[in-house]
Structure formats: C-alpha cells, structure tokens
Amino acid sequence: MNGGITPSGYYDNYNTEADTISISEGGNSCGYVQYNSSDFWSGGHCYTLRIKPTALISTPFLFHFLKWKEPDIMALRSGSGLPNIQKKDLSKVCIIVPTLDEQQQLIALLSTFQMKIENEEIFTSNLNKQKQHLLSQMFI
C-alpha cells in the first residue's frame, strides 16, 4: 500500500506484517482506512497502525472504530493540489476503548454485517455479469 484504496502494485517482499491497519496519507483518497490481512509493503503515502500484544484494544475493533470515523479522518485533509493528512492531526482523533469483552462482542456483530455486505457485493457483481452476457446474446 502506498496510499490509495487499492495496492499500487505487488512485490515479493514486505516491510509490514499482516494484521495491520493502514490509513492513506495523501491524494484524493487520504483518510481511507484499510485492514491488511497479509504481509505487505507499506509505502511513504500511508500511515500504519500495529497493536502491541499487551494493548487493551484489539486490531479488529480499532479497524471498525476507525472505519466508522473515516469521514472525520478524511475531513482532516489539508492542501488543495495534492491534499494530505498530517500525522499531528491524525493523532488527535479520539478513540473510545470499551473493555476487551465488549470489543469482542462488537467485532462479532460487525464482522457478520461485513460478511453480509461482501456477499451482497459479489452477488451484485455476478448479476451484472449475467446481465451483460444476456444483453450481448440479444443483439448478435
């Protein structure tokens, strides 16, 4: 990841381990929050957050919380030509940390909804492909 919403490319090496949150630092997508489930190369245009094992917050909870706050994070952008988010501004985002048990309950609920959304997106994509195929067959 080097900022942005999708990877800017792929590389057989990495400098950031899996289970990391990245936040796009610059450009039109600055403030975009993403969970990285595999090792990746973190470029200079994203911030990465890795939770220490002794922390009282879990990575999945922090990801869902920051994703919920994403509009507020995006509002931190400054500059007009190539907007960016300054680390000092990002560090001011207030994070509410419930107990670890409450975090786990929230993660279970939110993960269920996330899986439902992903399944609906796949279903919609497949329907669109079928539609395109059927339309192309009508006008041969």
Feature map (PLM): residue ranges:
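DNA target-recognition domains and sequence-specific DNA-contacting regions of bacterial/archaeal
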Residues: M1-V97
